[in-house]
Amino acid sequence: MPLSLRLAPSPTSFRYSPITSTGAGGFSPVKQHCRIPNSGVATKIGFCSGGGGVLDSGRRIGSCVVRCSLETVNVTVGQVTEVDKDTFWPIVKAAGDKIVVLDMYTQWCGPCKVIAPKYKELSEKYQDMVFLKLDCNQDNKPLAKELGIRVVPTFKILKDNKVVKEVTGAKYEDLLAAIEAARSG
């Protein structure tokens, strides 16, 4: 039986990204990536229920990320969709001929937090593309390994279900150039 995919966000599927109002929280902007330890660290995702902007940890946050599950695989343009090992490939396939940009990050990575608002802005600018985020925690380690991640953040650009470009580190200009190259090529 073919998998049926819903292409609109579920009203209960919103999660806030962990960007603090003070920026990188003490991380130097010179550092552009974090190494992923071999052991892998399972991270806890904080959820906001009433849109009040406070995570479980008590930190204020700024932007919103859509989260999906296999039951509600959501592909939308103009926003960032949080994926996991179970929903990534179905969403990439559902995107059809659209270019897919994937941000592979961790909750504890300072440079990932610094570039997250810029990544969100790109999703709003490039309405003809699908922007995804994958938390490279222990649960998603098999997919991260399959995609060949060594550092976070790593950005993968996919066309026709294949990786065509990769940018490692929080290098906004390089990411922008890779997106433009994928669009024109």
From Swiss-Prot:
Task: State the superkingdom.
Answer: Eukaryota
The site feature described as Deprotonates C-terminal active site Cys is recorded at D103
For this UniProt entry, the molecular function terms from Gene Ontology, in alphabetical order, are: enzyme activator activity
- What are the cysteine partners in each disulfide bond? C109-C112
Pfam families assigned: Thioredoxin
A Gene Ontology cellular-component term: plastid
Site for Contributes to redox potential value, residues: G110, P111
The active site annotation covers C109, C112
Maturation and modification: Glutathionylation at Cys-136 decreases its ability to be reduced by ferredoxin-thioredoxin reductase and reduces its efficiency in activating target chloroplastic enzymes.
Q: What are the Thioredoxin domain coordinates in residue numbering?
A: 59-184
Q: Which UniProt keywords apply?
A: Chloroplast, Disulfide bond, Electron transport, Glutathionylation, Plastid, Redox-active center, Transit peptide, Transport
Subcellular location as annotated = Plastid, Chloroplast stroma
A single Gene Ontology biological process assigned to it is: response to light intensity
Query: What does the protein in this record do?
Result: Probable thiol-disulfide oxidoreductase involved in the redox regulation of enzymes of both reductive pentose phosphate pathway (Calvin-Benson cycle) and oxidative pentose phosphate pathway.
In Swiss-Prot or TrEMBL terms, this protein is called: Thioredoxin F2, chloroplastic
Naturally occurring in which organism (per UniProt)? Arabidopsis thaliana (Mouse-ear cress)
What broad taxonomic lineage does this protein's source fall under?
Eukaryota, Viridiplantae, Streptophyta, Embryophyta, Tracheophyta
